[in-house]
């Protein structure tokens, strides 16, 4: 205030002293002195809102007949995300060369070159003088994220069936093709990486014809890396993929495709509007939970969140609520939303089912003092992935930790990487286990995910009718020269052969029914080793089968180390038990008393190792001829060892568990 008064006083005195000039200010003062460049927040927001409104006006003029929702179907690492980048550049959503894998938001996705979370982007494209609104959904290719894939397909009218020209059709191409075919999607065959020296387009096209019975005469040959022929894709999408069906005048019917957590806005939902319209201020209700919310904002991904006034039937976009949805468990993927008051007039969309965890691990902090940090890290990651189940558990050996459930082994590995890299967590992860079903004689059925809850031998004899384990139908593709080795591997893992087909003279598709427990025990690594890396694997659930499964425990001086117990098939208990005791012995320090390490199934010991104690030479000071004194001292030492064994606790360092649990 004082400064403003001084300026006013100076201006009044200066004008009183000087004659008033008739010249304009820009002639009196040089341009650089007269104008001070500045940028205000209000000005920036006004410019942003003006750009958004221009975009919104252009979208509002496009009827639903000129909407196209499509995705890319491919095996992992066949170039989906790179092709998505080229399409975004082609439609002006991003600048050429400005980013790589725009739709891969997670660090782990960029590091591994895989897509984990389904992402979407809206594009505007002018074709024959008319604007088209295109929604591209980049889906994961790996089997663990099949739920993400199937939900994404439900939002689409068609798909680009992308095949690597050098590698040809592979297992996940086959699995994802049938998933897309079952959803009734229009498929456009596309060959990628045709610029590679190893590319063989004719062989790849022949595989597509024989495997999928597709007409490949109009297949588009592209290079996502260089942009070769990518410009042909969008006109083909417009001409061949049908427009979504919907009516914006009907009551709202909206599918929840995905969700993620924002610190400031709560849970943000990725949605596909089938009928009606949604805008900020509307009150909506979930069919799965019955909970009601007020909409705070709606918008499209362009490629980041871009607010809009309304989302219409046929559009894919995001919404968040005000007050925000704070618990990500409320966002049930595949759920249907409608406006409050229309619940009885709207049919929920079919196909909603909760994702089921099929692989379980226990996670403990390397240092017990870091449990709170691990808990915070796990909770933050679970906010963005509702398919992970979390239960607290405690181990005598490792202290407090968590029992985590995942969709598959890659899902587990990605979560572990994110814990270590994004949150700096130092953790111990136990080997993965799968759930088992216990059918009791009274008809009660219990699913067990923690080996600690597995019934003991006496209960199994007296109360249990049967035990079951989950099976999967595995699809393997590989060159026929490795057929013998692959069949041998599958048989060694208790597999049951179903079909064997040649989809080219040298390529085989083999289908085997395998126990899921065998699959998570590094089956894929062994398969890659048997085929020099040429095999691909995909699988789907195949129900439960009666099995002779047992609980294998590690005992140290007859005390169970609960953290490493596993449920295994009886035929593998002895082999695995020998591996356990041998490996554990390497990492446990010698102590003043004997340490006995055993692997046990119930009361039966299947393997044993002994760590001898340190021994003091009590005879060092005795005369050689003093036999009676020698015997007396040795007996005394033996009695002392018995007392020490009775009261001594084996102290096992965390580093021993870390080394034992590492592969």
Curated annotation (Swiss-Prot):
Q: Give the InterPro entries listed for this entry.
A: EF-4, EFG_III/V, EFG_V-like, EFTu-like_2, G_TR_CS, LepA_C_sf, LepA_CTD, LepA_IV
One Pfam family, short name: EFG_C
Which GO cellular component term is one of those annotated? Answer: mitochondrial inner membrane
Might you name a Gene Ontology BP term for this protein? positive regulation of translation
Protein topology in the membrane: Peripheral membrane protein
> Out of the domains of life, which is the source?
Eukaryota
Q: Does the keyword Hydrolase apply?
A: yes
Here the transit peptide covers 1-51
Binding-site list for GTP: 74-81, 138-142, 192-195
Please state what class of enzyme this protein is. hydrolase
Instruction: List UniProt keywords, sorted A-Z.
Output: GTP-binding, Hydrolase, Membrane, Mitochondrion, Mitochondrion inner membrane, Nucleotide-binding, Protein biosynthesis, Transit peptide
Q: What is its EC number?
A: 3.6.5.-
GO MF, any single term = GTP binding
Q: Where is the tr-type G domain?
A: 65-245
This chain's protein is named: Translation factor guf1, mitochondrial
In its UniProt entry, the species of origin is given as Talaromyces marneffei (strain ATCC 18224 / CBS 334.59 / QM 7333) (Penicillium marneffei)
Q: Which gene encodes it?
A: guf1
């Amino acid at each position: 205030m004082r400064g403003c008064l001084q300026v006013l006083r100076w201006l009044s005195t200066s004008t009183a002293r000087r004659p008033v000039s008739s010249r304009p200010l820009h002639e009196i003062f040089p341009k650089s002195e007269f104008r001070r460049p500045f940028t205000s927040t209000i000005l920036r927001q006004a410019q942003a809102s003006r750009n958004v409104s221009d975009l919104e006006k252009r979208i509002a003029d496009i009827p639903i007949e000129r909407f196209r929702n499509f995705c890319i179907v491919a095996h992992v690492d066949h170039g989906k995300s790179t092709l998505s980048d080229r399409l975004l550049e082609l439609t002006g959503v991003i600048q050429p060369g400005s980013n790589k894998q725009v739709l891969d938001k997670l660090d782990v996705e960029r590091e591994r070159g895989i897509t984990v979370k389904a992402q979407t982007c809206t594009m505007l494209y002018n074709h024959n003088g008319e604007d088209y609104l295109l929604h591209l959904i980049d889906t994961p290719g790996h089997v663990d994220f099949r739920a993400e894939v199937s939900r994404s397909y439900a939002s689409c009218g068609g798909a680009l069936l992308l095949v690597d020209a050098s590698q040809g059709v592979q297992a996940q191409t086959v699995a994802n093709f049938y998933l897309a075919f079952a959803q009734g999607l229009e498929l456009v065959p596309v060959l990628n990486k045709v610029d590679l020296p190893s590319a063989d387009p004719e062989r790849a096209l022949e595989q597509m014809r024989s495997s999928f019975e597709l007409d490949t005469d109009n297949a588009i040959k592209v290079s996502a890396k260089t942009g070769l022929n990518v410009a042909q894709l969008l006109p083909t999408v417009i001409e061949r993929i049908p427009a979504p069906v919907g009516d914006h005048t009907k009551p709202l019917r909206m599918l929840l495709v995905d969700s993620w957590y924002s610190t400031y806005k709560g849970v943000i939902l990725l949605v596909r509007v089938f009928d009606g319209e949604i805008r900020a201020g509307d009150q909506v209700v979930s069919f799965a939970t019955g909970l009601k919310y007020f909409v705070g904002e709606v918008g499209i991904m362009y490629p980041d969140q871009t607010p809009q006034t309304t989302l219409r039937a046929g559009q894919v976009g995001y919404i968040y609520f005000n007050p925000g949805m704070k618990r990500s468990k409320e966002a049930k993927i595949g759920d249907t939303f409608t406006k409050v008051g229309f619940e009885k007039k709207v049919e929920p969309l079919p196909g909603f089912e909760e994702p089921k965890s099929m692989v379980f691990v226990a996670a403990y902090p390397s240092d017990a003092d870091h449990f709170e940090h691990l808990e915070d890290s796990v909770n933050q990651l679970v906010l963005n992935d509702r398919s992970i189940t979390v239960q607290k558990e405690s181990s005598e050996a490792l202290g407090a930790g968590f029992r985590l459930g995942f969709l598959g082994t890659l899902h587990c590995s990605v979560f572990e990487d994110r814990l270590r890299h994004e949150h700096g967590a130092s953790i111990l992860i136990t080997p993965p286990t799968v759930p088992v079903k216990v059918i009791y004689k009274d008809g009660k059925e219990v699913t067990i995910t923690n080996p600690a809850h597995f019934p003991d031998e006496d209960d199994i004899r007296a109360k249990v009718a049967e035990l079951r384990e989950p099976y999967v139908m595995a699809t393997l593709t590989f060159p026929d020269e490795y057929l013998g080795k692959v069949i041998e591997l599958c048989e060694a893992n208790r597999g049951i052969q179903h079909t064997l087909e040649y989809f080219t003279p040298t390529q085989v598709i083999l289908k085997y029914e395998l126990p899921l427990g065998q699959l998570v025990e590094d089956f894929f690594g062994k398969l890659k080793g048997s085929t020099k890396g040429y095999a691909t694997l995909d699988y789907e659930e195949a129900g439960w089968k009666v099995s002779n499964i047992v609980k294998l425990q590690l005992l140290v001086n007859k005390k169970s180390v609960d953290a490493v117990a596993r449920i295994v098939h009886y035929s593998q208990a002895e082999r695995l038990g020998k591996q356990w005791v041998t490996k554990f012995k390497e990492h446990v320090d010698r102590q003043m008393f004997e340490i006995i390490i055993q692997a046990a199934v119930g009361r039966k010991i299947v393997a044993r190792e002994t760590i001898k104690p340190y021994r003091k030479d009590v005879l060092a000071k005795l005369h050689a001829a003093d036999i009676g004194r020698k015997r007396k001292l040795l007996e005394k030492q033996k009695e002392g060892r018995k007392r020490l064994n009775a009261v001594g606790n084996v102290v096992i360092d965390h580093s021993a568990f870390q080394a034992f649990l590492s592969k």
